[in-house]
Swiss-Prot record:
The encoding gene: polr2h
Complex formation: Component of the RNA polymerase I (Pol I), RNA polymerase II (Pol II) and RNA polymerase III (Pol III) complexes consisting of at least 13, 12 and 17 subunits, respectively. Directly interacts with POLR2A.
SUPFAM superfamilies attached to this UniProt entry: Nucleic acid-binding proteins
Organismal lineage: Eukaryota, Amoebozoa, Evosea, Eumycetozoa, Dictyostelia
GO process terms (BP): transcription by RNA polymerase I; transcription by RNA polymerase II; transcription by RNA polymerase III
Name of this protein: DNA-directed RNA polymerases I, II, and III subunit rpabc3
Task performed by this protein: DNA-dependent RNA polymerase catalyzes the transcription of DNA into RNA using the four ribonucleoside triphosphates as substrates. Common component of RNA polymerases I, II and III which synthesize ribosomal RNA precursors, mRNA precursors and many functional non-coding RNAs, and small RNAs, such as 5S rRNA and tRNAs, respectively.
Cellular component GO terms held in the UniProt record: RNA polymerase I complex; RNA polymerase II, core complex; RNA polymerase III complex
Cellular compartments annotated: Nucleus, Nucleolus
Annotated stretches, region: Non-specific ssDNA binding: 16-40
Keyword match Oxidoreductase: no
Keywords on record: DNA-binding, DNA-directed RNA polymerase, Nucleus, Transcription
Species name: Dictyostelium discoideum (Social amoeba)
């Protein structure tokens, strides 16, 4: 059993397209290499500096390597986890799942302690994503 709900490599296309709103956070506009997904993601750049680079992003329901459920939002740092393979990890909630009327795309909105994520694309590549689900977002540079 796997806890990975989505996985792809993204390339940063724009940084803060509407201007810088916060000192330590930037909004990145990205496009995926494999599934043609659009991504807007807020990242705490004082913790995880990112420029016009490629990065791998995973959405997961749990950090447990065996895929077992983890609803606590925390994990035991003394045992191996999915987080060990990534540089930047956030825990949050899907707060909006919207189907586009004019196309076969969906828009998934998530909040990670106020840092927002918008992932848009073909719903075939987002089968385990559900409204109100608690998820982990994991990133490492490609």
């Amino acid at each position: 059993m796997t806890s990975i709900l989505f996985e792809d490599t993204f390339e940063v296309k724009e940084i803060d397209p509407d201007g810088k709103k916060f000192d330590r956070v930037s909004r990145f506009v990205c496009y995926s290499e494999n599934y043609e997904m659009d991504l807007q993601i807020d990242i705490a750049t004082h913790i995880y500096p990112l420029g016009h680079e490629r990065f791998k992003m995973v959405l997961a329901s749990s950090l447990n390597l065996d895929g077992s459920s983890d609803n606590s939002g925390s994990y035991d740092t003394n045992k191996p986890s999915l987080a060990d393979k990534y540089d930047y990890v956030m825990y949050g909630k899907i707060f909006k799942y919207q189907k586009e009327n004019s196309s076969s795309k969906v828009s998934v909105f998530a909040s990670f302690g106020g840092l927002l994520v918008l992932l848009q694309g073909d719903p075939r590549y987002l089968p385990g994503i559900e409204l109100d689900a608690r998820i982990y977002l994991l990133i490492k540079k490609a």
